[in-house]
A protein has these predicted regions:
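Hydrophobic or amphipathic alpha-helical targeting/insertion segments
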Residues: 42-59
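Loop/helix patches that line or flank the sugar-binding groove of alpha-linked glycan CAZymes
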Residues: 256, 265-268, 277, 282-452
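N-terminal substrate-binding region of glycoside hydrolase catalytic domains
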Residues: 12-30
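Single conserved hydrophobic/aromatic residue that forms the stacking wall/gate
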Residues: 1-6, 11
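Alpha-amylase-like alpha-glycosidases and glucanotransferases acting on alpha-linked glucans and related
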Residues: 17, 31-35, 40-43, 64-182, ...
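C-terminal beta-strand-rich structural cap/linker in extracellular carbohydrate-active enzymes
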Residues: 465-489
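Short, flexible loop/turn elements at secondary-structure junctions
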Residues: 25-28, 59-61, 187-191, 216-218, ...
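Solvent-exposed beta-strand/loop surfaces of large extracellular or lumenal domains
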Residues: 450-470
Length: 489
């Protein structure tokens, strides 16, 4: 298990953009002068508790007023030596709009007596290369220059190595030396893959156990960032997340699940699965399922269908609604990342540091118990942690008992342990029956047919079930729920 710690950022009004890559946000400290020591102690405590620490690394953009107060001796600030008369130079850290002041269709006062002044204007983090960003742009950020001249055919200038590459490598090495275990790289595909392929091997040469996770949304670039960029894992947002959300909401058939993993063509073990993150709407929000427990089938699939990692967003296990009307963020089904705020479910669970569940309601307690059991199953069961996967959808199409549009089933196998996982995306309980084809028995090396006593791992209950090639195995499923049935072969 790993805990993801937010970027080493400083907040400036609405934005939450990096002001200093070498510092810890003072707002997160108990004692501001000791904030770096507190971070180092957090890493040590996490390791002592059996956790690993992954921090957020935002390589594409920084705050417009970036300036490091905490950089090590001898380090030159980003932009400090830029030639601001040039729109692009491989030696610059930023992109400029020469001889032009930042104007923008935005409020440059933000309550201040004098407007914010920037001359010359810099390009925004979302690739706006003029001086007129609007409120839909990442106007509070400026894009870092990795040697691509976007305004001249995206021409690449990587020889000699651009200065930004060296600066960002040094930043990664700085945090790696703190004993962390990995980086979640924000919007990694907005940074050239050549940089990642250059920097990740250098970081791993000194810290071989570190992992790199890329936030990436373009399936056409997956292999590029895995094999040329050297990432360990990629976000599976536009594939499995979008599919499971659509099935949970009743917009899509469960038969879409095998289509999604098959489309990955063998890299599915390199994908990071999730049902919530800071950019997406909460499961329990009015914009998604309206109730955290309705995603139990999707969560079982996301966590158990392969050996790849799964991510849980804080409060997801409590069914946090994300329906507060926060300041800048507003009532959008997400927990704000822009405002000072208190998350209701987390606050009640925390209970002044007691973490005793006293102020959680029964639904929250039950959902938390489900997540606790599920994640422990993922770590403790060898067939799920290391085993092979066999999708049963193709053998259960157009059945009169198994509803392939609302139910999904698959097998996991390792050594003499077999696990049958079935979920029901329907709100109505199902008296289902799954057909396990002869090919599954052959592929998984199951040689004994007949009756078994299976243990349902989420509840601990036992069931007598018959495993026979091309014969249906009856399984009762509650609405919006699932079973994880373990057989000892």
């Amino acid at each position: 298990c790993a805990c993801l710690v937010g970027s080493e950022m400083c907040i400036r009004d609405r934005p939450y953009a990096i002001k200093d890559y070498y510092d810890v946000d003072p707002d997160l400290a108990t004692s501001i002068p000791d904030r770096m020591k507190e971070f180092e102690n957090l890493v040590k405590r996490s390791h002592k508790a059996g956790l690993k620490v992954i921090i957020d690394f935002v390589p594409n953009h920084v705050a417009r007023q970036y300036g490091s107060d905490a950089k090590p001796e001898g380090v030159t600030d980003l932009g400090e030596k830029d030639d601001m008369t040039k729109a692009f130079s491989p030696n610059n850290n930023f992109y400029y709009i020469p001889d032009t002041k930042l104007e923008g269709n935005i409020d440059l006062h933000r309550g201040a007596a004098e407007p914010y002044i920037e001359f010359p204007a810099k390009a925004t983090g979302n690739d706006r290369f003029d001086a007129w960003p609007n409120s839909n742009d990442w106007y509070e950020t400026v894009k870092l220059n990795y040697g691509i001249d976007y305004m001249n055919g995206h021409s690449r200038h990587f020889e000699p190595i651009p200065d930004t590459w060296v600066k960002m490598r040094d930043i990664l090495l700085f945090w790696s030396a703190k004993g962390i275990d990995g980086f979640r790289c924000d919007m990694a595909e907005m940074v050239p893959v050549e940089f990642w392929g250059w920097v990740i091997p250098q970081i791993k040469a000194e810290h071989p156990e570190l992992i790199f996770i890329a936030e990436i949304y373009n399936p056409g670039e997956y292999r590029n960032y895995l094999f040329n960029g050297k990432f360990d894992y990629l976000y599976d947002k536009v594939g499995l997340y979008d599919t499971l959300r659509a099935i949970t909401c009743g917009w899509e058939s469960a038969t879409a699940i095998p289509q999604r993993w098959q489309s990955l063509g063998g890299i599915e073990k390199r994908m990071l699965n999730f049902l919530e993150n800071h950019d997406e709407q909460r499961i329990a929000s009015d914009y998604f399922a309206g109730n955290g427990s309705k995603a139990i089938p999707a969560m079982i699939v996301s966590a158990c269908m392969n050996t790849n990692p799964v991510m849980i967003y804080f409060g997801q296990e409590l069914g946090e609604h994300g329906m507060d009307t926060e300041g800048f963020s507003g009532r959008d089904g997400r927990t704000t990342i822009f405002d000072y705020w208190s998350v209701d479910s987390i606050r009640r669970w925390r209970n002044g540091g007691k973490f005793d569940n006293k102020f959680l309601n029964e639904d929250e307690k039950q959902l938390k118990q489900f997540y606790t059991r599920l994640l422990n199953i993922c770590n403790s069961e060898k067939a799920i942690r290391e085993g092979v996967f066999f999708d049963l959808t193709y053998a259960n199409l157009a059945g009169w008992v198994f509803n392939e549009h609302k139910q999904y089933a698959f097998l996991r196998k390792q050594d003499d342990e077999l696990i049958l996982i079935m979920v029901n995306f329907d709100s109505i309980p199902a008296r289902s029956a799954v057909n396990i084809p002869q090919h599954a028995f052959d592929y998984l090396g199951i040689h004994r047919y007949g009756e078994y006593e299976a243990t349902e791992l989420l509840t601990g209950n036992t069931e007598k079930l018959t495993l026979m090639p091309d014969k249906t195995t009856p399984v009762l499923l509650d609405g919006m729920n699932g079973k994880i049935l373990k057989f000892k072969l």
